[in-house]
Swiss-Prot record:
This is Acyclic carotenoid 1,2-hydratase. Residues 79-89 have a biased composition (Gly residues). It comes from the Bacteria. Optimum temperature is 30 degrees Celsius. Enzyme activity is significantly lower at 20 degrees Celsius and 40 degrees Celsius. It comes from Thiocapsa roseopersicina. The gene is crtC. Residues 33-46 have a biased composition (Low complexity).
């Protein structure tokens, strides 16, 4: 998982994109006053070029039944709890995503894509969310005793790079949702799995200043990983790194943008709100000569969370290795988000650049030493204690309008 595009210090009054013109009239009559929202922090334009640093996640899921399926314990988990490993329950993972799964009331399911162009000039993040985890509307519904996840859906799109920054996260209700095994419709946007590739047709409006984001993204996995990992002792939260190595083709009409590059797909699902199970986590991934290396270190609210260190190759095979010692990183400069990572003894980890500094989420470039290789990672820190605070909750609505229905 990860959160993305969330409330950077200037996000509430961010400069508007250049392509506003008449697109703002679309959907305008149906938007309720913008409320908070966010998902996961896109890299800002103008950061250090990051050829080969693929970060992301999203897509694919398991069989048609309820969200279930447990696995054997991961050898890399800390203590005796968390970090279990197994095959996605009720499905053939080689067949790709299933979009018709049932979700526990109060729970969530998302598919996440992150990609970077081959020249390092452009990037994107897309999250298709059912039971939007950072939605204030969903939180209010849970408090009222009506926690219907399918009434709180969104397609979060973040574009960054030379063409400028775009960010969308319009929440939609149950009437705007259509689910089939190989297709998911959220309002005017949809995701389709054809057996070999994922196609995402985007038709969304940016916030807070409206402009259109429209076009097609194709994701071609090198292979589909067959293992999933539980993140909490109760096994209610599951992470599936579906395709850590993928090719991505971007063809957008608005803004006019065409590029191809490398990407990463995963999916997260849970049977309760994230903040009920976790205090915080650090997550990172990097391309290395041996493949894609990933670290996921979770602090559970009760018991022991997962501590995972994984290597993936282009064939989709995953190898666990013992997590290196945990080290502290400097807190972020504005919102003072705590950060940490793992690094082999005798070496030092360092923050190369802070990309996003928000009230409860930070995204950074971090250099560390993993499995005998120096790696520059895209790194994320999420504080769910911060997220759950009343002050932060009041901030969230400015980036997430909701369409009724």
């Amino acid at each position: 998982m990860r959160a993305a595009g969330i409330l950077t210090p200037g996000a509430l009054w961010a400069p508007g994109p250049s392509d506003t013109r008449d697109e703002r009239r679309h959907d305008a009559g149906r938007l309720q006053p913008a409320l908070p929202g966010d998902g996961r922090g896109p890299l800002r334009p103008g950061v250090t070029r990051m050829e080969g640093l693929l970060h992301a996640s999203s897509v694919a899921q398991q069989g048609a039944g309820a969200l279930s399926g447990r696995g054997e314990r991961a050898s890399g988990s800390r203590g005796t709890d968390g970090g279990h490993v197994g095959t996605p329950g009720g499905s053939d993972p080689a067949r790709g995503p299933r979009f018709d799964l049932r979700i526990t009331p109060g729970g969530y399911l998302w598919w996440y894509l992150d990609a970077l162009s081959d020249d390092g000039d452009h990037g994107l993040t897309i999250i298709a969310m059912l039971g939007s985890v950072f939605s204030p509307y969903y939180a209010w519904a849970r408090r009222r005793g009506n926690p219907d996840p399918l009434n709180h859906c969104a397609l979060n799109v973040a574009l960054y790079g030379k063409a400028g920054k775009r960010w969308t996260m319009t929440e939609r209700g149950r009437k705007a949702l259509r689910q089939a095994p190989g297709r998911l419709d959220i309002g005017p946007s949809h995701l389709t799995w054809d057996g070999t590739a994922l196609t995402i047709d985007v038709n969304e409006i940016t916030a807070p200043i409206p402009s259109r984001v429209r076009g097609r993204i194709r994701v071609i996995p090198a292979a589909v990983n067959a293992r999933e990992f539980t993140l909490d002792p109760a096994e209610r939260h599951v992470w599936w790194p579906i395709a850590p190595i993928s090719r991505v083709e971007v063809d957008l009409e608005k803004p006019a943008l065409r590029w191809s590059g490398h990407g990463y797909l995963d999916s997260n699902r849970g049977e309760e709100p994230l903040e009920d199970a976790f205090q915080c986590w650090d997550w990172s991934r990097a391309n290395t000569p041996s493949g894609t290396t990933m670290l996921y270190d979770v602090t559970a609210r009760h018991g022991t969370g997962a501590s995972l260190a994984l290597r993936f190759n282009a064939s989709g095979e995953v190898e666990e290795f013992p997590p290196p010692p945990r080290v502290r990183l400097p807190t972020t400069g504005i919102w003072r988000i705590k950060r940490g990572t793992q690094c082999e003894a005798g070496h030092q980890a360092r923050v190369v650049e802070t990309l996003e500094d928000t009230p409860f989420y930070a995204r950074s470039l971090v250099e560390t030493r993993l499995a005998g290789e120096t790696a520059t990672c895209v790194h994320e820190s999420l504080s769910l204690d911060r997220f759950a605070s009343p002050v932060v909750q009041l901030m969230l609505p400015f980036r997430m309008p909701r369409v009724g229905g």
